[in-house]
């Protein structure tokens, strides 16, 4: 039986801080949540410019999974259907479709994180 809350993030990048501030913000947030006992999954679109510049390919504080397309993301979201929440970050490739896909999974909670708000 799972006791920790499970959160699934779909974000721009966690694995590469090259050319974006999202990775550093996500890293700090997820490290803090992990320290509080959350089970964390981060789903990141595998794009060539981040693939060539990964500075955190295997984070120790969450499960990072790269996906190639929306069909693959659908399978990953189904795999994590037991999550307590799905959180989708701003600037995710195919953002509208990703939100629609996540909503169709009817998670207990679905949230949008405008990670660019402080900018």
Question: Where in the sequence are the language-model features?
Answer:
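Nucleotide-activated donor-dependent transferases that construct or modify glycoconjugates
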Residues: 2-19
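Non-catalytic N-terminal targeting/anchoring module and adjacent flexible stem/linker
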Residues: 1-2, 84
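Extended catalytic core of nucleotide-activated donor transferases of GT-like folds
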Residues: 19, 26-31, 40-119
């Amino acid at each position: 039986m799972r006791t920790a809350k499970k959160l699934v993030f779909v974000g721009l990048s966690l694995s590469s801080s090259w050319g974006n501030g999202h990775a550093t913000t996500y890293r700090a947030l997820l490290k803090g949540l992990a320290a509080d006992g959350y089970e964390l999954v981060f789903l990141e679109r595998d794009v060539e410019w981040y693939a060539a510049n990964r500075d955190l390919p295997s984070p120790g504080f969450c499960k990072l999974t790269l996906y190639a397309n929306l069909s693959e993301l659908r399978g990953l979201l189904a795999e994590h259907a037991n999550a307590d929440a799905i959180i989708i970050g701003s600037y995710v490739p195919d953002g509208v479709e990703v939100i629609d896909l996540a909503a169709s999974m009817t998670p207990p909670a679905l949230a949008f994180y405008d990670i660019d708000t402080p900018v």
